């Protein structure tokens, strides 16, 4: 790849906040983290950020199914996602959410800049509408047959089989994912981003040679079929940011989602105080911006995103690093087979370094799918990490501790061999730089084989039994420890947990620059097991656990679906509310209002006037007179055009005629406090 700047901003695609992280997701975050850790080892200033993609109809509907607000759901998802990434040692500098004030401000600013520069068009469109649910259907909530390749069961925005994009109205035999009904067409006004206006700029980007060949080729296919204006609007109900000056219209999630990269970085700048947002995002920035993404979202990142940035006068990405999908045991991940494995299920059974190593061994700069074969996974981890690398230290460290009080020799037994290991750093560095992690591991394991052959030939266990061979034994074991140190330095970006334990054992930090100088006359600690073998039984247990933990979300219907439970509050906040029993002494219509009733309430020594929106439920207000009810007594008086309302009566129900005034049990009296 081309020269990397000294300052880098690196992102992973934003996980969607409606489900758990699984082993398909984690591939990308491991890939990016390895590259980031390598760049940091080489002295680069790297800012590694991510966020939850927290908007859209799927989140709104799932929260409704769960009977909670979208805000409450995405908050819990964010906590879970961050715990999972921490469990895999993903070294983010900041993890944020697209449902943030930073993202709202930036989305609005970018939209207004695009509009000012003439890149936003409006037009009336016909859109699919679910009459059963009373809502316009976003593209991901329509399924049907792809109009291009005729693949069945495809979403309304793009085909997962042929990669084509289209509008939901082009689907053959569309159906609503929400209700299963056949949608009808209705007209609505939408705003569009003028993507074709950026065709020349985007084609220059293709010809620059920076993009992966497979990405550039796919982009050319899209150009050949013609770019279309991009609908950036969604109709209410929708969980997201409302478009300025367009009530009831919301930004499509794919407009504000990539802006989430900027929002997360802005949040980091605000936290740190010593970072400049403009230095990394202004049009003339000298820094590098890299996005690690999956091949399923190339279209949005290679066309829409750079065009949106160009149109709003921000810098474009330096490059996209695209990876393929993950299969398990040669097949698509399956909940029924237990191969739909969540990050948490994996971490309950294995060290994160095991999967980091296995994925790294299979990763290249190409967009190839990766198969997680569990038998191969167990065999490779044991063969490479345990038998080849850690075993090198365990075969020599004991002699150093027992015979030489933990002190390494003053000289190496084979300085030429050590120099050969050090000389490989340039080749291995190039592999890391170019994201050819599999090649890097092959080169490192070839060195590990050489190191173990050296120990086999020198046989320190034999030398230890020979009198007068102490210096030779110390030199051989010192050599083995130093070769282990070189190998672990090369593996440091991949195996952070093992590296940390190895640094404690060696009592030195493993750095690229220190490789030229071996550890001599240096004291190490007593060797303890650095890494344990893994067993197939645990892999089988993980699969079984995954079968039992993946369960369909129980759909909540009725009142909780219509009015989800709000976010939790602290007890101290609840305790501030003073609810009292009140007798309705008088109830009358309010002139000029078809919703309100005027209630005169007796609190047992004090009278209050309250305006309540319950007229539809009580067409004869006189039936309320003499009833006891519950009121919020310490609500601040509210001035209305009909008079002052001095509290609020408590009622239940969805609204309209279905409102039911609350009444206390017998024995309660006006003025009693509700506890």
Swiss-Prot record:
Organism superkingdom: Bacteria
Q: Which residues bind Zn(2+)?
A: 146, 149, 159, 162
Motif 'KMSKS' region mapped to chain: 332-336
Q: Which cofactor does it need?
A: Zn(2+)
Cofactor binding: number and manner:
Binds 1 zinc ion per subunit.
Top-level class of the enzyme under EC nomenclature: ligase
* UniProt domain tRNA-binding: residue ranges: 573-675
Reactions catalysed, as given in the entry:
tRNA(Met) + L-methionine + ATP = L-methionyl-tRNA(Met) + AMP + diphosphate
Chief site of localization: cytoplasm
What processes does the entry annotate via GO biological process terms? methionyl-tRNA aminoacylation
Q: Which residues bind ATP?
A: 335
* Motif extent ('HIGH' region): 15-25
GO CC, sorted alphabetically, is: cytosol
Q: Which CDD domains match?
A: Anticodon_Ia_Met, MetRS_core
What sections of the sequence does the record tag as coiled-coil?
none
Q: What is said about its interaction partners and assembly?
A: Homodimer.
Please describe what this protein does.
Answer: Is required not only for elongation of protein synthesis but also for the initiation of all mRNA translation through initiator tRNA(fMet) aminoacylation.
| Name of the protein | Methionine--tRNA ligase
Name of the coding gene = metG
